């Protein structure tokens, strides 16, 4: 009988550690949470606690260890909803299941201003983006040069993963440029 009680308690503990809602957000809405390069599990854990997101720290820490999250911290931008359970949170963070960010740009006068504006919204830095935007060999197959590359960027709101590379960002913007400037639009212009 004692064994059944102990076994039942353990099963209840595991179940609640995994599936009981353990995330609380102040306004009840999802929050953005960023994990930076070279950030440790301890740092991620501290940020979650400082934001007041984790209701039961012991169960979060126990399950994190069991699911090997400390060895699998992934960089990214995550959307954490109110009422999420530990299992879903840890799976999202350790698998790198990012939520896209909205990247908005308009009224940038120079390519340098543009690169600064983009690096304020994504993980990539201004220097790496400027390096790609000045690389003739990279731009030429797309039909651009460092002198005319600014016309590729059509002001709008775009969704990107926060960790996108400078090269992937420019390739995506080239795709958006081609999608916008159809043959019909080119003839009208």
Regions found by a protein language model. Name each.
Residues 1-189:
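Conserved catalytic or metal-liganding residues and their short signature motifs at active sites
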